[in-house]
Design a protein with these regions (language model features):
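Beta-sheet entry/capping signal
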Residues: 36-38, 174-175, 217-220, 276-278, ...
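Substrate-binding/active-site clefts of carbohydrate-active enzymes
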Residues: 145, 180-353, 360-386, 403, ...
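Conserved alpha/beta catalytic core and glycan-binding cleft of carbohydrate-active enzymes
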Residues: 367, 373-538, 542-543, 547, ...
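Short, flexible loop/turn elements at secondary-structure junctions
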Residues: 41, 67-69, 79-81, 92, ...
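Core domains of carbohydrate- and sulfate-ester-processing enzymes
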Residues: 90-160, 231-239, 245, 275, ...
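Conserved, mostly hydrophobic/aromatic
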Residues: 39, 88, 179, 221, ...
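A generic secondary-structure signal for well-formed alpha-helical elements
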Residues: 84, 92-94, 183-184, 188, ...
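Carbohydrate-interacting/catalytic domains
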Residues: 1-177, 182, 199, 507, ...
Length: 719
């Protein structure tokens, strides 16, 4: 059904002010004399630029963009300057059955807007159709949405960066620290109340000092692009806290700007760089906040729905929903691909960001018939002279058919490895049949990533992430406790592979608490001593809790915020984690550039990794297949070849021993060439670091149940 477009004109129309302008660059660009406006739409018939007062409340004039070049509507407004508040109204067919949902009664956000002002206010006027109408989304709503929509603001991009430069931490030295702008700063005692929850809060010295002293390399921020709070959450007094509901890919969310100025983000980046920390942004290019056919018309839906979104081929009224949120952006369309890559380049060049983590990244590599590692977007990122220099991290799955693509992204990408999470959790919980998989996870899951010249760092290892239990809760709860989300505890995963160790939630039992803390040390030691790229979630390093909530997406509250009031046990864990990170960075063998494969290298007479049974002998096939096996030694030979050059390495030789049994296992320490004895550097049974003890070859070490040890080979003359 095709509907006519009607809209009430504003009080003033001054078409004579506009000039032709240029179709490039897209967005609103100030050149010092005026502002050029350019908007892509392949199917619109007319575009109006709407100018608002400084408060963004009164529409002052409406000006038709006069030119249309290569599917770009454009015009130039002389004497316009930064600070100008604007939006668009776009005309065309309202024909949902054929994918078109133009409605000029709806003020639209420029997809290239660099700053938004105001917050979205939910109203029925936001929808292109009339809610409650018998025809549903086929109906046409004539109410003006301008009073309820955030407005776009023209910016002056000039900024004095001083000596700031990209930190460029090598992948083998990268340790990711996943956090949230509000979550990290809302309860920090050193952050002034007026900047808590903002980029300015992240600049506070004590916040940066904690991250720097921890030893991580890269701060990965949950989404900071402007986003929309879901209406149903606001009705319950909640918000879309995590921010995975973007509406403007070039604009930081206004709520994170204490000063209201874009420069605040740049200053934050400069402060982190000064602390030698990279800035990684979690980005959500797989969908927008406009939802499915019943969602609001806020931006791309009203600009060119049929171009921006993937629609059902047999009925374009409906959206393909590989994101699980109602819609899916179509990166097979060249202009959508351009928008996403332009956005990435903007954040990398103009905002000095060091890398990106892509939410539901499989979508970004989808054509109509599924995922293709040669997708134009993935190829463009590899070839682009800017993007090929920054870190690209994929969450390699989505909700669509064939969405699980771990290990299948092309060279140049690293990937979240959820198999590491699941295997490590199951192993330390004591599940049967985990030993062989555990060994694979400790060697960067080579069966998935050791191909096409990819390196071990391609596997991003994690035990916890923002979605799911915190590390403390992983060892304290068997079941999720999401009652605070007001969804009858139906939200969040039920497959947590968690274990409460005897009591659900907090307990005063000293034995249970001791075991829980040992398990946290086990998880951290496994993560930080494994090959691959480790990722830590902020607060886990001192046992932060969400009280059993494993889906705090809507908890902009003390549930979702980091509590900086450390307990004695939390402070002890923090010291332990710092020591593990220092060990990882000190010993290159823990972060090799080549996969450990367990083959004997005849050229240099060395086997890079040897897997040992408790009696000190090599593991047999039968032992690998024993579903009850829970104890293993991992001997990493420092003489193993480190590069493509066939020569011996010069690194330390280390022995990692794990015991996931309930009881003590006596482990025979092996004799190794060019060594004299072993020293113990880590024992997770010990909450504090102790002096290095000497252990002779073939001596037995009593490995406590549920513990991990790390030994270093020493020569007699090194005493």
């Amino acid at each position: 059904m095709t509907r006519p477009n009607k809209t009430t004109p504003p009080p003033v129309i001054e078409a004579s002010r506009i000039r032709e302008g240029l179709p490039f660059p897209l967005g609103a660009t100030w050149d010092g004399l005026g502002v050029n406006f350019a908007l892509f739409s392949a199917n619109a018939t007319k575009v109006e630029l709407c100018i608002f007062d400084d408060a963004g409340e009164v529409e002052l004039e409406r000006i038709e963009l006069p030119e249309y070049t290569d599917e770009i509507y454009h015009g130039y407004l002389p004497d316009a300057h930064p600070g100008l508040i604007y939006g668009y109204r776009v005309y065309g067919a309202y024909d949902p059955a054929n994918g078109h949902r133009f409605n000029p009664n709806k003020l639209l956000i420029d997809p290239y807007a660099k700053q938004l002002v105001g917050q979205l206010k939910w109203s029925e006027a936001l929808f292109g159709y009339t809610i409650g109408h018998p025809d549903g989304d086929l109906s046409f709503d004539e109410r003006d949405s301008a009073p309820f929509v955030p407005k776009c603001k023209v910016i002056d991009p000039a900024h004095t960066w001083g000596h700031d430069h990209r930190v460029s931490v090598p992948w083998d030295k990268t340790i990711l620290y996943e956090t949230h702008v509000r979550g990290l700063t809302m309860r920090h005692p050193s952050v002034p109340e007026n900047v808590r929850g903002t980029f300015a809060g992240l600049m506070v010295d004590d916040v940066l000092e904690h991250i720097r002293k921890l030893g991580v390399s890269s701060v990965e921020l949950l989404p900071i692009h402007a986003f929309v709070n879901d209406q149903h959450l606001l009705h319950k007094g909640m918000t879309n806290y995590w921010g995975y509901n973007s509406i403007a890919f070039f604009a930081p969310d206004p709520r994170y700007l204490a000063s209201g100025k874009i420069a605040e983000f740049k200053e934050m980046v400069a402060h982190l760089h000064e602390a030698n920390l990279e800035v990684i942004l979690d980005v959500v290019y797989n969908h927008t906040a406009e939802g499915n056919e019943q969602g609001p018309t806020l931006s791309m839906r009203g600009i060119d729905n049929a171009s921006y979104y993937r629609l059902m081929p047999d009925d374009k009224r409906y959206y393909i929903n590989d994101s699980g949120t109602g819609n899916t952006l179509d990166l097979s369309h060249p202009c959508v691909l351009q928008m996403v890559t332009d956005s990435l380049r903007y954040w990398a060049t103009e905002m000095h960001v060091d890398g990106f983590r892509f939410d539901l990244a499989t979508i970004l590599g989808r054509y109509h018939d599924g995922f293709d590692e040669r997708h134009s977007f993935l190829v463009a990122c590899r070839q682009d002279p800017v993007l090929r220099q920054v870190k690209m991290i994929a969450e390699p799955w989505d909700c669509g058919p064939g969405g699980y693509q771990v290990g299948r992204f092309p060279p140049g990408w690293v990937e979240w490895n959820d198999k590491f999470r699941d295997t490590v959790r199951a192993f330390w919980k004591g599940d049967d049949g985990q030993l062989a998989d555990f060994a694979s996870r400790m060697t960067a899951s080579g069966e998935m990533f050791n191909q096409r010249g990819r390196r071990p760092y391609a596997s991003v290892n994690f035990v916890t992430a923002h979605d799911g239990f915190t590390l403390h809760d992983l060892v304290s709860y068997n079941d999720k406790h999401n009652e605070a989300n007001d969804e009858n505890n139906q939200d969040g995963s039920n497959n947590n592979l968690s274990w409460n160790h005897g009591v659900e939630g907090p307990t005063d039992d000293p034995e249970i608490n001791a075991l829980r803390h040992r398990q946290m040390r086990n998880f951290f030691a496994t993560l930080l001593l494994a090959q691959g790229t480790p990722m830590i979630v902020a607060g886990d390093e001192f046992a932060r809790t969400q009280h059993g909530n494993n889906n705090a997406y809507c908890q902009d509250s003390e549930i979702g915020w980091v509590n900086w009031d450390l307990s004695e046990d939390g402070a002890t864990l923090l010291k332990f984690v710092k020591r593990l990170i220092k060990l990882r960075l000190t010993y290159p063998i823990l972060r090799r550039g080549r996969f450990l494969v367990g083959n004997y290298n005849e050229d240099i007479g060395v086997k890079d990794v040897t897997w040992l049974a408790p009696d000190g002998s090599e593991m047999t096939i039968e032992q690998w297949q024993d579903s009850h096996g829970r104890c293993l030694g991992m001997l990493m030979d420092g003489r193993a070849q480190e590069t493509g050059i066939r020569r011996k390495g010069g690194d330390a030789t280390l022995l990692l021993v794990v015991n996931a049994h309930h009881d003590i296992v006596n482990f025979s320490l092996p004799e190794v060439p060019e060594g004299s004895f072993w020293t113990c550097m880590v024992d997770t049974n010990q909450p504090t670091v102790r002096g290095q003890e000497r252990f002779d070859f073939d001596s037995e070490y009593s490995v406590t149940g549920r513990s991990l040890l790390l030994f270093e080979l020493q020569r007699e003359e090194e005493e």
